[in-house]
Amino acid sequence: MRKKFFCTFPQGLISEPIISHTLGERFAVIPNIRAASISDTMALVAVEIDGEPKAIEDSVAYLRERGVKVEEMTDNE
């Protein structure tokens, strides 16, 4: 299964490799960053996450627990 999300990272998490490293290792998903805009105060990231439904759900919950705002994208976005 593959789902698309739009993530807003707060300033304190910008330099951490949460998507590229942590999600893949901790939740056995394959994240694919499709677009990103990063400034000194926040990061906006469009990402596809491929994996089992429960693993995707757990990875999104983890991001939210860390303070990332996560919104699922529709097929039109």
Predicted regions and their residues:
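Long, contiguous binding/interaction regions
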Residues: 1-77
